[in-house]
């Protein structure tokens, strides 16, 4: 246990366009090699494209996509008497959002062809509609947790 107490989480300032911390965190995840202006351009273009295609506000699409893509339960390895069990645990809201953003981005990058903003917009639309690679990933994680429900008693110490 640390003796110095806990460190407060740094929350980035909200982004200028949507005034949302969540969007700023997403921009930071999209950013590569410190090129934030390019990441902002990609995210904003993707939001505009998704809003245009679905005829709904961009923030509503993004928040719903994040909510749909985040897992409720996941497995964590726990070593008990020489054997490692995959123990299902509930996912905290911060981690749920972080995983959802990470998976959305990974799925968008895995798509081929087209510019990044189009791939990201397509992935956001898929997550909004509860389809696509991101949702499949979430369902796989939750299925794994469900399969290992027998070991859930190891999660409580």
Swiss-Prot record:
Do the record's keywords include Ribonucleoprotein? yes
Q: Which GO terms describe its cellular component?
A: small ribosomal subunit
Q: Keywords in alphabetical order, please.
A: Ribonucleoprotein, Ribosomal protein, RNA-binding, rRNA-binding, tRNA-binding
List, alphabetically, the InterPro entries matched.
Ribosomal_uS7, Ribosomal_uS7_bac/org-type, Ribosomal_uS7_CS, Ribosomal_uS7_dom, Ribosomal_uS7_dom_sf
GO MF annotations, alphabetized: rRNA binding; structural constituent of ribosome; tRNA binding
Biological process, per Gene Ontology: translation
Q: Name one Pfam family in it.
A: Ribosomal_S7
| CDD domains documented for this protein | uS7_Bacteria
Chain segments annotated as coiled-coil in the UniProt record: none
Q: Which family does it belong to?
A: Belongs to the universal ribosomal protein uS7 family.
Q: What does this protein do?
A: One of the primary rRNA binding proteins, it binds directly to 16S rRNA where it nucleates assembly of the head domain of the 30S subunit. Is located at the subunit interface close to the decoding center, probably blocks exit of the E-site tRNA.
How it assembles, according to the record, is: Part of the 30S ribosomal subunit. Contacts proteins S9 and S11.
Q: Which PANTHER family match?
A: RIBOSOMAL PROTEIN S7 (PTHR11205)
Q: What is this protein called?
A: Small ribosomal subunit protein uS7
Tell me the organism: Roseiflexus castenholzii (strain DSM 13941 / HLO8)
Record lineage: Bacteria, Bacillati, Chloroflexota, Chloroflexia, Chloroflexales
């Amino acid at each position: 246990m640390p003796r110095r107490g806990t460190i407060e989480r740094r929350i980035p300032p909200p982004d200028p366009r949507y005034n949302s911390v969540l969007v700023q965190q997403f921009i930071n995840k999209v950013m590569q090699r410190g090129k934030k202006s390019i990441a902002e351009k990609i995210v904003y273009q993707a939001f505009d494209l998704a809003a245009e295609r679905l005829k709904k506000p961009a923030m509503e699409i993004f928040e719903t996509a994040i909510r749909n893509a985040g897992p409720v339960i996941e497995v964590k390895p726990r070593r008990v008497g020489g054997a490692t069990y995959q123990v299902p645990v509930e996912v905290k809201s911060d981690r749920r959002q972080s995983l959802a953003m990470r998976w959305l981005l990974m799925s968008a990058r895995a798509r081929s062809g087209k510019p990044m903003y189009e791939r990201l917009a397509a992935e956001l639309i898929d997550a909004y509609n509860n389809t696509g690679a991101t949702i499949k990933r979430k369902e796989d994680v939750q299925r794994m947790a469900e399969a290992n429900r027998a070991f859930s008693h190891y999660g409580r110490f």
